[in-house]
Amino acid sequence: MRRLLNVFVAVAALGLGASLFAQSVPEINYDANADILSLPSFGEVAGVATNSKGHVFVYARTGHAAATLGDERTFYHGGSRLFQFDPAGKFVKEIGQGVYSVNFAQQVRVDPQDNVWIVDAGSNMVVKFDADGRLQLVLGRKPENITLRTGPGMPARQIDVPPEGRGATAEAGRGGGAGRGGGGGRGNAGAPGTGIPGDNFNRPSDVTWDRAGNIYVADGYGNNNRIAKFTKEGNFQKSWGQTGSGQGQFNQIRGIAADAAGNLYVADAGNKRIQVFDGEGTFKSQITGIGTPQAICVSGGATPYLFSSNSNDPESIENGEIYKIRPTGQIVGKFGKAGKLPKEFGIVNAIDCRTENDLWVGEIWNWRAQKVTLRR
């Protein structure tokens, strides 16, 4: 009986220790302001980013995409909008009006040269605008809805490409051939686990760059589950990754960020971890204990930090926090929780962190962008 009691006490102590460990992440004090930007309503804020002058860019899902019908094609467009604000929050202009790629917002980023990049999961494109909003580069291709005529008097064969990133048929898009990309629908992405290489995407989720200007696209919301690398001119170089839970495998990539040392941090949401790679795709380490990473960001400055949001279900009040992490993987602290009030978060899909204490976060479920200031 005494032996059983000792075992019970030991097990209880282990459980208590685990509970204490789980609660040992320090809380970071912070302030937040959701009323800075002048537009009254965005819709779902999928992306928020700032440039070196303090201007704020918001890429939001403002409504269902419209369909323009033609004799041969149906074009889906207009489901999202990209807004620019000055440092005081005053609306400056809208960027990308009428651009074919703007359909279903997924992310916006600003590179070191102040170019503005959007990632669109509906058109399966990554688009670069210069600092003045002029279109400079397009990666990927939006599959068309085309009526193919097979000959005089022959019935038409319809290639149907639905809007907002849903699966297309295997024939749609440039990526149908072997060794090309996901094209934009599940049919072109191949069976789960294949990680098909190429320069087309299947619902891309994020983009980042290294110091040489190479471009890295997280091709992660479809079933490609890979990172695609391009030169700064937009030429495809290589890709790595496939569906799975091992090193270098992914289960829904929701974000990617790079630090000055060339490390790439990949939010592997389905596996509840952040994987770290070099620029050639060599696995280096992984970070766990941070929930389900949704949005990630690496701060500037002499001592960079990684920020990662814990994705929360719309009805959940158990998480939704943002973690502050050293590049070594050490968790410094966390702040925030799920909710709709100021200083609470409703699925943070975007984090901008020019410094370690001044952040912007974009929220899907609360339809807003909050400016967050961490207290020193």
Residue ranges: model-predicted function:
Residues N6-S19:
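Bacterial N-terminal signal peptides
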Residues M1-L4:
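Positively charged n-region of N-terminal signal peptides that target proteins for export
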Residues F21-R376:
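Eukaryotic scaffold repeat domains enriched in small/polar residues
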